[in-house]
Amino acid sequence: MGKTKTRGRRHQDKQRKDEFEPSSNSAKEHIQQEESTYNDEAEIKETQPQMFFGVLDREELEYFKQAESTLQLDAFEAPEEKFQFVTSIIEEAKGKELKLVTSQITSKLMERVILECDETQLKDIFQSFNGVFFGLSCHKYASHVLETLFVRSAALVERELLTPSFDNNEKEGPYVTMENMFLFMLNELKPHLKTMMNHQYASHVLRLLILILSSKTLPNSTKANSTLRSKKSKIARKMIDIKDNDDFNKVYQTPESFKSELRDIITTLYKGFTNGAESRSDISQSTITKFREYSVDKVASPVIQLIIQVEGIFDRDRSFWRLVFNTADEKDPKEESFLEYLLSDPVGSHFLENVIGSARLKYVERLYRLYMKDRIVKLAKRDTTGTFVVRALLEHLKEKDVKQILDAVVPELSMLLNSNMDFGTAIINASNKQGGYLRDDVIAQLIQKYYPEKSDAKNILESCLLLSASTLGNTRDDWPTAEERRRSVFLEQLIDYDDKFLNITIDSMLALPEERLIQMCYHGVFSHVVEHVLQTTRVDIIKRKMLLNILSKESVNLACNVYGSHIMDKLWEFTAKLTLYKERIAKALVLETEKVKNSIYGRQVWKNWKLELYVRKMWDWKKLIKEQEFEIFPNSKPLQPKPEKHSRERNNSKEGSAFKKQKHYR
């Protein structure tokens, strides 16, 4: 007999008591007020960041605006000329640095100057912010300047570390290392760490500092998945055309003092959140609940994710993980409620997805076993929340658990793909990682979704790429959308996964009107799909000929196009063992020599097709073709003479007929 459902008012009261519900913004403000009741008014004023440092007068503003425009144009004849210009800006900016970095207009100039200045100038700018780093980190525009400054400073710390004899006579006065300047700045920020964690702008600065101190990659500030800036900031940075220099997207060596500072920062934050508790048993449930609220706060959550990622460098107990989650083998009602919130909230699911990737395996296995194992399909159906957690589990759990998830999810795959195409990629990767586990079932589900056998109008280009609703063929010069790019990448993954999808895609292309297929070749995204099917050894010769019949007609125009030229480069190999098609394309390009050579893309195609050799030494070009064919098809046999048996039979028949003739003449 199954378990009876518990009913009654007391049970409902207990459920409400255990339920996790984050505080509203007003409640958070109340919590912050409670935390500050022990400070007097003077101390409260000291903790408020100073963010106004005056404004530039009209003439100064006009000069710096013009300087910013000049740097953006970057029309200098020599690097020395550019450096002299940057030096003149720095001289003019002395004493006005704080006004410049807190202005929307001139903060962009300061970022450009920091990216272009030398080490001595960088240190001067760094020192000009002493005493106000906290205020600047909380400022909408100055915080971006600080991030650029800190990345360049990290690069300089490494250079000084690897070159102890770094020139210290560059300027008069005592020589100060970048390491010491950085440590001085960190001491200035330490009293404000908890405030920075939950601040709209300062939280990004804090995340960057943790990355630097832990020797993690300092990401590009304009990439979509960058941890350095917010989504709005990355878009704005692209629009104002500030390009990162070579110091970004790298890992830097750091001195031992940085590891000590990282430990000190994380320990300080932990004590701040636990009210200085000596052991875990001294931490109250209300304290744990408050910290869990921080974990699902859209500003503080990324910082906590990063702390959980790096705390293992020096803390074997993983204190922050244990502050968020329990470690006991039994279920906990409050933790269960918290997990349910994480699995159904966009911020919470992103938090759980990321910490799963950096936590100890035994901790992840515990969460999976207690709270997710029995409802994995239901979680996968939560396309904006739970599905991301399931993907993380597929990537990080042991083989046995991954196979259990695949057993549950694969039969539902065609339905799950309706709302989350990326989930298909996760399933394919997990199946491959487990030695092709359930591979045939995965393929069957994918075909059922994108190329159903019973459908008369089946076309994977339509079902997967949604061609009819896309920007293909638009005359308004619409940019390809992010959704089109995502779908194209997924189809390319399917093509690589199994030959069935390669052949299905080619069949779908051949089913299109020729004009439509040619349009795909000129599209910024869909051209990659056309390029991806041109795999010489995987496509049978009949389908190769059918594709070449269409593409060869457009060879000259394709060669002169930014996207089509890549397809033409692939056709050089795709025409192997199809000499007639190769010569037809080469002849068409040579007949339009002027047009091809006048195009930057056409010149590259001309070079890759070895057409200078074709024009000057045709036989050498044909010899090159034969060598290429042998490289691509090393096991293919050239035309062989008839076997000896047949030749003997032929000779015998000739001798027999001759004997008959002799007999006849007798």
Swiss-Prot record:
Keyword DNA-binding appears in the UniProt entry: no
InterPro entries found in the cross-reference section: ARM-like, ARM-type_fold, NOP9, Pumilio_RNA-bd_rpt
GO biological process: endonucleolytic cleavage in 5'-ETS of tricistronic rRNA transcript (SSU-rRNA, 5.8S rRNA, LSU-rRNA); endonucleolytic cleavage in ITS1 to separate SSU-rRNA from 5.8S rRNA and LSU-rRNA from tricistronic rRNA transcript (SSU-rRNA, 5.8S rRNA, LSU-rRNA); endonucleolytic cleavage to generate mature 5'-end of SSU-rRNA from (SSU-rRNA, 5.8S rRNA, LSU-rRNA); ribosomal small subunit export from nucleus
Region (Disordered): 1-40, 635-666
Keywords: Nucleus, Repeat, Ribosome biogenesis, rRNA processing
Location of the protein in the cell: Nucleus, Nucleolus
Pumilio repeats: from-to residues: 92-127, 128-163, 188-223, 286-326, 334-369, 370-407, 511-548, 549-587
Gene3D superfamilies hit by this protein: Leucine-rich Repeat Variant
Keyword Nucleus: yes
Biased composition range(s): Basic residues: 1-14
One function term, GO molecular function aspect: RNA binding
GO cellular component: 90S preribosome; nucleolus; preribosome, small subunit precursor
Sequence ranges of Basic and acidic residues compositional bias: 642-653
Assembly notes: Component of the 90S pre-ribosome. Component of the pre-40S ribosome.
Function: RNA-binding nucleolar protein required for pre-rRNA processing. Component of the 90S pre-ribosome involved in production of 18S rRNA and assembly of small ribosomal subunit. Component of the pre-40S ribosome required for release from the nucleolus.
Homology family: Belongs to the NOP9 family.
Protein name, UniProt field: Nucleolar protein 9
